[in-house]
Each structure stands twice: as structure tokens, then as C-alpha cells.
A protein has these predicted regions:
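Residues at the C-termini of beta-strands that transition into short coil/loop
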Residues: 80, 103-105, 171, 193-195, ...
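A short, gly/pro- and small-residue-rich
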Residues: 126-142, 296-314
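Internal gly/pro-rich beta-alpha loop/helix module
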Residues: 109-110, 115-205
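Small-residue (G/A/S/T)-rich helix-start motifs and N-terminal tracts that mark the onset
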Residues: 1-71, 75, 166, 177-309, ...
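Short gly/ser/thr-rich secondary-structure transition/capping motifs
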Residues: 94-100, 125, 148-153, 214-219, ...
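Short, flexible loop segments at the rims of nucleotide/cofactor-binding pockets, characterized by
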Residues: 93-97, 119-124, 289-293, 310-311, ...
Length: 461
């Protein structure tokens, strides 16, 4: 896991005050981070266009031009003259070694965006909007310095934003880069070292970025076992049996020893999945909500009252009964529209999808502060998983998963791990990672993946 911070100004300040680095040293290391990436990735004498604003982000770019001089064909475009003293000093240094300044942008091999940093707190003027749009239209490899210009400190876009192939962010990961809105603009994310070891520069935080290496598969280490050793999943089916079948197959593929669909009507289901009209006596985890539709309230409450680990999904988030059971150790897996309903039922907020998507971290934190026992998994382009005051972000999701049934696979994976003894937080994190990594490895085109393809991918992780 990697630490994530809402802001890093305090980290920069601490580096200066406690570890005696200077603003100049921090900036030199920021520029070195950019320079090292460019030097490693691109051939000598490639054309590099560095586009700078008037603040410290622009000063980073001017410093970068100096470091790349004579190794690449460097051109420096300055939208506005530097306002800061360090920016003016960097400009003087660049001029002293005859860095090439240009008055127009052009098609270069590489474009580096150094216009605006994380301090952007106002609407862009028309010149800036036009420039960013023109940069986006260039067929160049695009690098954002620290943050794509146009993203504000909350990861929101008011007019336009630079669309990077990679963002090289300075010192530490920032929440602003990990919003759903930002995902189409940041590209890959790489952290540049600012002159101190990571564990010294960074402090404690409550937010973490999940890595592929964090995935812990339910591998079977014991040989003296039987099917009951690995848990018995019960998936409660409502009107739409398809969702329950998908979830049951995912559970079985992810290690559950037994899987039963609980339904009042006999259904035609896969032969390795069992059926029952009531929850099994030896059930070790329940999934409820997928394809639920209308179900008798007494029957629903009877299931919710069972002291068994649960995954709650889909239709359940529109039922007021759920509020009574949010003090229990359950996993909730809403998509944004369902989470809005849940926020309304709990009197936390009455907001639109747009408001939620612009402030996903905020509303997740609000919800989990009031319901600290719950593990919440908010679906999205970047999945947010939270329990109590801790937040974990999974950025491995892709548009391949934007298909009906993908969420049912996820619920099946989570309940499978719960049945096998994982804690609610462990189950949510590992199932989410498995779900997104399996989808990422899907080799065919990105519009054709089905739930069965995800399940097949799970089997070969």
C-alpha cells in the first residue's frame, strides 16, 4: 500500500523546517524526477516542449528545461512571467545557458504541462483554457508535472484539464489525483522523490492506495480438509435469478466450499450450486440484495437479523430496513446511485449523483464516521473501500467492468472470502483487487467482457 494525502504543503514545510532542505532543493529534486523519467523513456535529441505558468509549477518546468538542455531538443513556452522569487531565479538560470524560448506551441515528441499545480482555486481564464485544449489536441506524449492543469484541489474540473499519459506527482500521492473525474486525465501516476526517503518525508495518514501486491488469494494451505472447511455461502435470490447465479458462480470460483441459492421457487441453476428455501444451518456468510426486487419485509428482516457475516448490495439500499442493521459487521457495495439512496435513508445527505461524484471521499468519510462497524465499498472508476476512519483506493478498475453482472461477480467474491474466514475489510479489499485485476488481464477488446469472463479470470490469478 502507498500513503495518500489530502495536501502536501505541510510535508514540504516539514522538510524545510525539520530536515533543513530549502525550497530550491525541493524544486531541484522535483525537476530531477521529471528529468529522470524523460531520460529513461525517450531517445536523446527527442523534441521536448515544456509549457509553464507563473507559479511554482511553472518554475519546476523552467528548472526541467535547464536539466534537459543539450540532451534533448528543448523548447520552453511561458504563458505568464514567473511571479515567485524562485521562479524568477529559475528563469535567470535557464537564460544563462541559452535555453530555447518559443512563442507558440508545436507538435513535439513530448509535451510537459507545468501550467498550474495543486494550488489552483479559481476558474481558468480564456487564454489558459484555449492553451490546454490546444495541448490536448497535439499528438505528443503528455506528461503532467505534479497534477494535470485544470484539476483543482478536490480533483474537480470546472472548464477543461490537461489530459496526461502520465502524471509525475511530487513527494507523495494526492487525493485529488484519485477521484473518478480525474481518472481520464491523470494517466499513470508516478511519485518523484524530493530529497528525503519516503518514510521520512511522509507522515501518518488515513488513506492508502492499494497495490497489486496487496492481493492475498484464498490459497489452500491445509490438506486435511473437506468442503465444509472452506465455508458455506448462501446467496438470497429475489425476482431476478440471473444475478444470484452469477454471484454464486463467482463465490464457487473464489474458493467457497459450498454455495447455496436461497429462493422460494425452484430454479434452473448450475449443477454444482445447491438450492434451498431457507438459509442453511451451516451457512458461514450471506449475500443479499442482487436481483432482490420485491421481497416480503418479514422474510427480509428475518435474514438481516441472522448473526452471520453479510454482503449487502443493489436493491437493499432502497429499503428502509437496512438502517437498523448498519451497526453490524457487514460489507456494503453500492454504486453511486445506490449510495445516494443510502445517504438519504440515514439522513446524512440528500444529494445528486453529480454532487457525490465531485465529493466521493467526503461522503464516504461522513458515512463511515457515523457507522464505524460497516465496511463500505463504493463502486466507481476508482473503488473506495472504507471502515471506521481508514480509506483504501483501488485504481485498477476499467471501463471493461461497465457491464451488467460485474457487480454481482464482486458480491460473490466478497461473500466467498467472508465464508472462508476473512474479516469484512480483508474480504472487500481482496475481492475488489481480484475483480479489477482479472478484468485488467482480459485480452480481448474492452467492450466485450462478460461476467463469465471475469470469473474465468479469477480462476487463473
Amino acid at each position: 500500500m502507498k500513503k495518500i494525502f489530502d495536501e502536501v504543503r505541510s510535508l514540504d514545510k516539514r522538510a524545510i523546517e525539520e530536515f533543513h532542505l530549502t525550497e530550491d532543493i525541493l524544486m531541484e529534486n522535483a525537476s530531477l524526477g521529471l528529468k529522470n523519467y524523460i531520460t529513461k523513456k525517450f531517445k536523446k535529441n527527442s523534441s521536448i516542449l515544456i509549457v509553464c505558468g507563473s507559479g511554482n509549477n511553472g518554475a519546476d518546468g523552467i528548472s526541467l528545461a535547464r536539466l534537459l538542455q543539450n540532451k534533448f531538443k528543448v523548447s520552453l513556452y511561458i504563458l505568464n512571467e514567473p511571479k515567485t522569487e524562485i521562479g524568477k531565479l529559475q528563469l535567470k538560470r535557464a537564460k544563462s545557458i541559452n535555453v530555447n524560448f518559443v512563442n507558440q506551441i508545436f507538435q513535439a515528441d513530448v509535451v510537459v504541462d507545468c501550467l498550474f499545480g495543486t494550488g489552483l482555486n479559481k476558474e481558468l481564464d480564456q487564454d489558459s483554457v484555449s492553451l490546454i485544449n490546444s495541448l490536448n489536441n497535439l499528438n505528443s506524449f503528455k506528461i503532467a508535472c505534479d497534477i494535470p492543469s485544470g484539476l483543482n484541489s478536490l480533483g474537480q474540473i470546472t472548464q477543461t484539464a490537461f489530459k496526461a499519459d502520465i502524471t509525475i506527482t511530487m513527494g507523495a500521492l494526492k487525493t485529488t489525483l484519485l477521484t473518478d473525474i480525474a481518472k481520464d486525465f491523470v494517466g499513470k501516476i508516478k511519485v518523484a522523490n524530493l530529497g528525503l526517503p519516503e518514510d521520512i518525508f511522509q507522515i501518518e495518514t488515513n488513506k492508502y492506495l492499494l497495490q497489486k501486491s496487496d492481493l492475498k488469494l484464498p490459497l489452500r494451505d491445509i490438506q486435511n480438509s473437506h468442503k465444509g472447511t472452506f465455508g458455506h455461502v448462501n446467496i438470497v435470490s429475489g425476482e431476478k435469478i440471473g444475478a444470484s447465479i452469477i454471484a454464486s458462480q463467482a463465490s464457487f470460483a473464489f474458493g467457497a466450499g459450498l454455495v447455496t441459492i436461497v429462493s422460494q421457487n425452484e430454479k434452473n441453476i448450475p449443477c454444482h450450486i445447491m438450492q434451498s428455501k431457507s438459509v442453511s444451518e451451516n451457512c458461514t456468510a450471506i449475500a443479499l440484495g442482487m436481483g432482490l426486487g420485491e421481497i416480503e419485509s418479514l422474510k427480509l428482516e428475518e435474514i438481516l437479523q441472522l448473526n452471520i457475516p453479510k454482503v449487502l448490495d443493489a436493491d437493499i439500499f432502497y429499503n428502509p430496513l437496512i438502517v437498523k442493521y448498519l451497526d453490524e459487521n457487514v460489507v456494503l457495495t453500492p454504486h453511486p446511485k445506490e449510495f445516494i439512496s443510502l445517504l438519504k435513508l440515514t439522513n446524512i445527505a440528500n444529494i445528486s449523483i453529480e454532487e457525490l461524484q465531485e465529493n466521493r471521499f467526503l461522503y464516504v468519510e461522513k458515512f463511515c464516521k457515523i457507522y464505524p462497524k460497516v465496511t463500505l465499498l463504493l463502486k466507481g472508476a476508482n473503488v473506495i473501500i472504507s471502515k471506521n476512519d481508514k480509506i483504501y483506493v483501488n485504481i485498477f478498475g476499467s471501463s471493461k467492468l461497465s457491464k451488467g453482472g460485474s457487480g454481482d461477480v464482486l458480491s460473490g467474491l466478497i461473500v466467498s472470502l467472508l465464508a472462508q474466514g476473512y474479516t469484512s475489510l480483508e474480504a472487500a479489499i481482496n475481492a475488489s483487487l481480484a475483480h479489477t485485476i482479472a478484468a485488467k488481464k482480459y485480452k480481448n477488446n474492452n467492450y466485450s467482457m462478460s461476467p463469465q469472463d471475469i470469473i474465468q479470470g479469477i480462476k487463473i490469478l
